[in-house]
A protein has these predicted regions:
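Catalytic domains of carbohydrate-active enzymes that cleave complex glycans
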Residues: 7-189
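Short intrinsically disordered coil segments
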Residues: 23, 27, 207-210, 262-264, ...
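Outer-membrane beta-barrel proteins
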Residues: 234-236
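Extracellular ligand-binding/catalytic regions of CAZymes and related secreted enzymes
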Residues: 4
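Accessory beta-strand-rich segments of carbohydrate-active enzymes
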Residues: 239, 244-335
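Accessory carbohydrate-binding/adhesion or oligomerization-edge regions at the termini
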Residues: 164-232, 246-249, 304-335
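Short acidic/histidine-rich active-site segments
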Residues: 1
Length: 335
């Protein structure tokens, strides 16, 4: 953020200045003998954002597909730049500046890892990454309390874009499968069949029926659909109706039990769910950031079952956010 302010302030006084030169000047003044490596860090990250073929909009984490941008290769490269910077430092103030950037880096990578692990249904591992992020956050707070953006309580309570909010979501999901309030039956597959429905043909043609061959695509349910190519040439995500479908297996000992279905995260304003052709849920999505539960009817059967989901995402939400982006699972409540 301080680099952004530095560049913006310089450009406010003289908009013809060269941005590369401003960044170089900033690094020389702020990082001293480590400046060259920090400059490499900045431009490698900037290039990764610039070169993504997905829609990117600064100001909201939902509009930046960080999990696509931060590849393992990029993470390793950025850490190598920081390691080289640490080796070049001798002046205490510059050392502090590099240390702070390293903690920012630790915090960001741990936070992103926790988000990805939560989307994949690996909640125990996500909790560990959240703990790592908390350590980095604590280290930053000891340097200065305002180094990380302040998040008011309403943001924490309604969003997964803060560490505290993500921790609450992860614990909510974990409690449903680890015996706290329920036990896991099965995770639904990561990969589902998928089809956009811009002309609302799906209900008329009954796409929820068993074995409907309508030319489905295949997507993962751990990323927004925009992050998987469903966007226009300008980079804005698909807006309208879309359908998901998959099959799942249920063991004999679960048949006739009070099974619940939890969606870890769905971005869309209205949702329909069919199990074995029966509509079991239709309603407004109260929060695109938070999980929600559905009590399933008795038509869950031992063996193979089919689930179909219809989602309506309308024009209020723009950018890289649409569809199922955290894994769904079946569980049995303790009571």
């Amino acid at each position: 953020t301080h680099l952004n302010y530095y560049v913006r302030t310089k450009l406010m006084w003289n908009s013809s200045l060269d941005v590369d030169a401003i960044v170089h000047d900033y690094c020389q003044k702020f990082y001293g003998e480590a400046a060259d490596w920090i400059e490499k860090y900045i431009w490698d990250l900037e290039d990764a954002v610039e070169n993504t073929d997905l829609h990117v909009q600064w100001g909201n984490k939902h509009h930046i597909p960080w999990e696509i941008i931060f590849t393992d290769s990029l993470i390793d490269t950025l850490q190598e730049h920081l390691d080289h910077a640490q080796q070049r430092i001798s002046e205490p103030t510059n050392q502090l500046h590099v240390d702070v950037l390293q903690e920012y880096h630790h915090y960001l990578i741990a936070f992103l890892s926790a988000q990805q692990l939560t989307s994949l249904g690996k909640y125990d591992q996500a909790v560990n990454k959240i703990d790592e992020a908390l350590v980095a956050k604590s280290n930053l707070s000891r340097v200065r309390s305002n180094l990380l953006p302040y998040a008011p309580s309403w943001v924490v309570e309604t969003s997964d874009s803060t560490l505290e909010g993500l921790s609450d979501i992860c614990q909510y999901l974990l409690d449903r499968i680890n015996g706290t309030i329920g036990n896991l039956v099965a995770f639904l597959p990561c990969s589902w069949k998928f089809k956009t429905d811009p002309f609302e043909d799906g209900l008329i043609e009954q796409w929820y029926r068993l074995d409907q061959d309508i030319g489905w695509d295949s997507v993962t349910t751990t990323l927004y659909w925009e992050n998987q190519g469903y966007q226009n040439k300008a980079g804005y995500g698909y807006i309208g109706y879309a359908w998901y479908q998959t099959k799942f297996e249920v063991k004999n000992d679960v048949e006739n039990c009070p099974v619940s279905l939890t969606f870890g995260g769905v971005c869309g304003q209205e949702i329909w769910v069919w199990i074995n052709q029966l509509l079991v849920f239709h309603g407004e999505n109260e929060s695109s950031s938070k999980p929600f539960d559905i009590s399933l009817p008795e038509n869950i059967q031992a063996g193979t079952n089919q689930i179909t989901v219809r989602i309506h995402g309308h024009g209020f939400y723009r950018g890289a956010q649409g569809g199922i982006y955290r894994r769904a699972f079946l569980w049995i409540p303790n009571n």
